[in-house]
A protein has these predicted regions:
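Feature detects amphipathic, helix-rich regulatory segments
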Residues: 173-175, 185-189
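Extracytoplasmic gate region of multi-pass secondary transporters
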Residues: 154-155
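Central hydrophobic cores of alpha-helical transmembrane segments in multi-pass inner-membrane proteins
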Residues: 54-56
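Transmembrane helix-bundle signature of multi-pass membrane transporters/permeases
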Residues: 44-52, 172-180, 238
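Generic hydrophobic alpha-helical segments
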Residues: 59-60, 187
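Accessory recognition modules or surfaces
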Residues: 130, 180-184
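Juxtamembrane transmembrane-helix boundary motif
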Residues: 1-40, 60-148, 158-164, 168-170, ...
Length: 248
């Protein structure tokens, strides 16, 4: 019962953080596997199912607030869907520790780049939608890495989009939309792999409701945060997360 309460609370908090900044989803598989000793397939199945909910609810709220560039998001997501399909397969071939090291190195560099980068007048989404092939490749690579490592997507995608010149709130909206197309093939693949684990399917509806509530509340309040402050929060959080995972 204690484990269930902790899982519900974690999904509420992580959902809220995802709604606000786009990041924190990686905490779910880390908690499930690291603290509860869940099998890898079960922890990833529960995590990516939650990421699907956060992606849908978060995207809707960010779209309503005018912070979702569908053109960029659609191109990126097309690449991510294909990449995620490959990522689930890669997870079975490459040691998970290796994939996590790759992920957090990229997160670390992205966070540092955001802190060092200075905003320029007129820096808008126009810079980011110029190259369709670039965003297809970016989506494929990030989708594969995230699906294989257990990260939902925004923790890697959001800092990169911000680095490319996309406003912070819009970058969160795009990364949440993109996470839907990482989560669909990933959740399906890992749920199939965990088909023999009845506990997963009993926990799923309760945890998804808790996660959804957190995301809804967080994304509703995201625009109340100053954009410059949001960038710094994401950058510092990304650096801290990466350093903890890489060096501790």
């Amino acid at each position: 019962m204690l484990n269930l309460i902790l899982m519900i609370l974690l999904n509420l908090v992580v959902g809220g953080c995802i709604g606000l900044t786009g990041i924190a989803g990686f905490l779910l598989p880390m908690f499930y596997a690291g603290f509860l000793d869940m099998p890898s397939s079960a922890s990833l199945a529960l995590s990516f199912a939650a990421f699907l909910i956060s992606g849908i609810l978060g995207s809707v709220n960010y779209y309503k607030s005018g912070n979702l560039d569908l053109k960029t998001a659609s191109v990126l997501s097309a690449g991510s869907f294909v990449g995620a399909l490959a990522g689930v397969k890669i997870n079975l071939l490459i040691p998970a520790d290796t994939m996590k090291i790759i992920l957090y190195l990229v997160v670390l560099l992205s966070g540092i780049s955001i802190l060092l980068r200075k905003d320029k007048p007129g820096n808008t989404e126009k810079k980011a939608v110029q190259s369709v092939p670039f965003f297809l490749v970016l989506g494929a690579v990030t989708g594969a890495v995230c699906a294989a490592s257990g990260a939902g997507g925004p923790v890697l995608v959001m800092p990169i989009l911000t680095l490319l010149g996309i406003p912070a709130h819009t970058a969160v909206g795009i990364s949440l939309f993109d996470s839907i197309f990482i989560a669909v093939p990933s959740a399906a693949g890992y749920l199939i792999a965990a088909a023999g684990n009845k506990e997963v399917f009993l926990l799923l509806p309760v945890l998804l409701v808790a996660h959804g509530i957190g995301v809804f509340v967080g994304s509703k309040n995201a625009t109340k945060i100053n954009q410059t402050l949001l960038k710094r929060i994401v950058a510092v959080a990304s650096i801290a997360i990466a350093c903890i995972k890489l060096f501790l």
